[in-house]
Amino acid sequence: MTRSIKKGPFVDAHLQKKVDEQNEKGTHNVIKTWSRRSMITPDFIGHTFAVHDGRKHVPVFVTESMVGHKLGEFAPTKTFKGHVKDDKKARR
């Protein structure tokens, strides 16, 4: 289910505070965050977030097409290493 419109988007208060401070100063420094659940709002456009994926912080540059999605969608938590080829010749 999606979130109710009357509630509005969820953004962690500390993250919104950092974005507001940078918008006032006119700077666009990287904002390190562990808040993967925060929704991207229009005032995040042009900022770069370092979103934690459980191991490291992945840089995510926010564009217009990302508005309405969550930060965690752009920092995958699992790395796919590929399927191992099961071949008799490879074992020799």
Swiss-Prot record:
Q: Which family does it belong to?
A: Belongs to the universal ribosomal protein uS19 family.
Keyword set, alphabetical order: Ribonucleoprotein, Ribosomal protein, RNA-binding, rRNA-binding
An example GO BP is: translation
Q: Name one GO cellular component term.
A: cytoplasm
Q: Indicate yes or no for the key word Lyase.
A: no
Function recorded in the entry: Protein S19 forms a complex with S13 that binds strongly to the 16S ribosomal RNA.
Q: What is this protein called?
A: Small ribosomal subunit protein uS19
Please give one Gene Ontology molecular function term for this protein. Answer: structural constituent of ribosome
Q: Which organism is it from?
A: Bifidobacterium adolescentis (strain ATCC 15703 / DSM 20083 / NCTC 11814 / E194a)
Q: What NCBIfam families is this protein classified in? A: rpsS_bact
Q: What is the lineage of its organism?
A: Bacteria, Bacillati, Actinomycetota, Actinomycetes, Bifidobacteriales
